[in-house]
Amino acid sequence: MTNSQAPMQAAEVRVYPIFTVRWLAVHALAIPSVFFLGSIAAMQFVAR
């Protein structure tokens, strides 16, 4: 009943790139969105 391979053998470790097309797309949308939300929030405190 002995197995030639260890049952809890670690799988190959993959190294993923940080900058991907998805990363660029998310940040291209997220950064201006946060900027505009902050701008709109700041406008609420500007007295006319």
From Swiss-Prot:
GO BP annotation list: photosynthetic electron transport chain
Chain positions recorded as heme binding sites: H27
Cofactor note: With its partner (PsbE) binds heme. PSII binds additional chlorophylls, carotenoids and specific lipids.
Keywords: Electron transport, Heme, Iron, Membrane, Metal-binding, Photosynthesis, Photosystem II, Thylakoid, Transmembrane, Transmembrane helix, Transport
One protein family per Pfam: Cytochrom_B559
Disulfide bonds: none
SUPFAM superfamilies referenced in this protein's UniProt entry, alphabetically: Cytochrome b559 subunits (SSF161045)
GO cellular component, one term: photosystem II reaction center
NCBIfam families xrefs: cyt_b559_beta
Similarity field: Belongs to the PsbE/PsbF family.
The protein's assembly and partners: Heterodimer of an alpha subunit and a beta subunit. PSII is composed of 1 copy each of membrane proteins PsbA, PsbB, PsbC, PsbD, PsbE, PsbF, PsbH, PsbI, PsbJ, PsbK, PsbL, PsbM, PsbT, PsbX, PsbY, Psb30/Ycf12, peripheral proteins PsbO, CyanoQ (PsbQ), PsbU, PsbV and a large number of cofactors. It forms dimeric complexes.
Cited function: This b-type cytochrome is tightly associated with the reaction center of photosystem II (PSII). PSII is a light-driven water:plastoquinone oxidoreductase that uses light energy to abstract electrons from H(2)O, generating O(2) and a proton gradient subsequently used for ATP formation. It consists of a core antenna complex that captures photons, and an electron transfer chain that converts photonic excitation into a charge separation.
Protein name as catalogued: Cytochrome b559 subunit beta
